[in-house]
């Protein structure tokens, strides 16, 4: 079975995140299951135009526009048995316009919900309009999504429920596992430093607890457009806050493992990848009760879902007092999600849709 996956980024892209992790983890496991796996993506300028990454034959085109213009060419060149159009960046690949074969659409989340404050009003309206066109572009094709939230968003857009399949992501349970916590209480924020992720709240939470927890420490990892703004907030403060920037995956796993509580403030998620990695590491999360996150945090089990920023303080203090129970429950929750299970679900779906139109 030959599969062609269109996506805007791959695992080696400097801005790769949870979405690209899914492509990589699923893709390399599909290869082991005998799939001839092709990935067509965008070259940020510093990567090879072609290379094989753990069995995934990766073609990179310079520029988003050129990548989209190459869809027909790549379909003819590779002649796949099944196609995946990955919608992590909203702009559709429109593969059904160039092939009669079944196209599977990988819908991550509704971008319209996270656009305010990220792009100008005109661009926000354009992206929102494009998302509303999905039912027309991908009429009668299968949509795969990861969460109940995203499934409901698709139905709201006009996609038939019978054309939607939920395949949750997995987590590397060997890399992300419980371990010894730091001697002093260490809070963690890890993820993109963008406005809709609201990482600035991490500093607010730290300040709320500063006089209650001795030697309290906060670690903020990741990169993004508001990094300098966050640093500016604390430059004259005597806070124990470290900005680590973008770090490698193994180092990230170690930091998550040793932290006491993971903080999450995003406006919305398709699926909370970081929340699942934190849970696997025995590190509970406190997060806002927002779309996508509600699928990844079970209230009062592997963390807490709250309605406003002022609730973070009491929930963190409660977790600290009941640390061992939350470590145990967090790991138990994550053990339901493995990349092997996710890849098998993808394999069965793809296999059932080859030449089945």
PLM regions and their residue ranges:
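Carbohydrate-associated surface elements
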Residues: 149, 170
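Nucleotide-activated donor-binding/catalytic signature segment of Leloir-type glycosyltransferases, i.e.
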Residues: 231-247
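Aromatic "clamp/platform" in nucleotide-sugar-dependent glycosyltransferases that forms part
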Residues: 267
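Conserved acidic donor-binding segment of nucleotide-sugar-dependent glycosyltransferases
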Residues: 299-310, 318-322
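Short hydrophobic beta-strand element within catalytic cores of glycosyltransferases
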Residues: 275, 284-287
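Conserved donor-binding/catalytic core segment of Leloir-type glycosyltransferases
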Residues: 4, 144, 180-208, 219
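Membrane-proximal helix-turn-helix segments that form the acceptor-binding/catalytic region
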Residues: 122-144
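Short alpha-helical donor nucleotide-sugar binding micro-motif in glycosyltransferases
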Residues: 246-247, 254-259
């Amino acid at each position: 079975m030959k599969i062609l996956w269109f996506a805007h980024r791959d695992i080696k892209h400097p801005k790769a995140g949870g979405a690209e992790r899914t492509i990589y983890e699923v893709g390399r496991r599909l290869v082991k299951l005998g799939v001839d796996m092709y990935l067509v993506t965008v070259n940020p300028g510093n990567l090879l135009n072609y290379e094989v990454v753990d069995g995934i034959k990766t073609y990179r085109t310079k520029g988003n526009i050129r990548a989209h213009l190459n869809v027909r060419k790549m379909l003819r060149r590779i002649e796949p048995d099944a196609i995946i159009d990955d919608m992590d960046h909203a702009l559709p690949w429109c593969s059904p316009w160039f092939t009669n074969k079944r196209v599977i659409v990988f819908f991550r989340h509704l971008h319209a919900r996270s656009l305010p404050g990220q792009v100008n009003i005109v661009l926000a309206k354009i992206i929102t309009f494009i998302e509303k066109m999905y039912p027309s572009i991908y009429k009668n094709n299968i949509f795969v999504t990861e969460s109940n939230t995203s499934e409901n968003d698709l139905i709201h857009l006009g996609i038939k429920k019978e054309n939607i399949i939920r395949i949750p992501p997995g987590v590397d349970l060997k890399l992300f596992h419980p371990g010894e916590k730091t001697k002093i209480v260490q809070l963690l924020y890890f993820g993109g430093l963008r406005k809709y992720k609201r990482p600035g709240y991490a500093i607010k939470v730290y300040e709320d607890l500063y006089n209650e927890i001795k030697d309290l420490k906060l670690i903020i990892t990741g990169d993004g457009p508001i990094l300098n703004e966050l640093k500016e907030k604390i430059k004259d403060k005597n806070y124990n806050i470290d900005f680590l920037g973008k770090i490698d995956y193994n180092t990230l796993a170690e930091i998550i493992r040793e932290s006491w509580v993971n903080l999450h403030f995003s406006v919305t998620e398709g699926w909370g990848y970081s929340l699942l990695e934190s849970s696997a590491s025995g590190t509970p999360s406190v997060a806002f009760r927002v779309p996508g996150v509600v699928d990844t945090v079970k209230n009062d089990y592997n963390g807490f879902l709250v309605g406003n920023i002022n609730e973070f303080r009491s929930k963190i203090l409660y977790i600290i007092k009941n640390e061992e129970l939350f470590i145990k429950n967090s790991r138990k929750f994550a053990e339901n999600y493995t990349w092997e299970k996710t890849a098998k679900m993808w394999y069965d779906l793809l296999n059932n849709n080859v030449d089945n139109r």
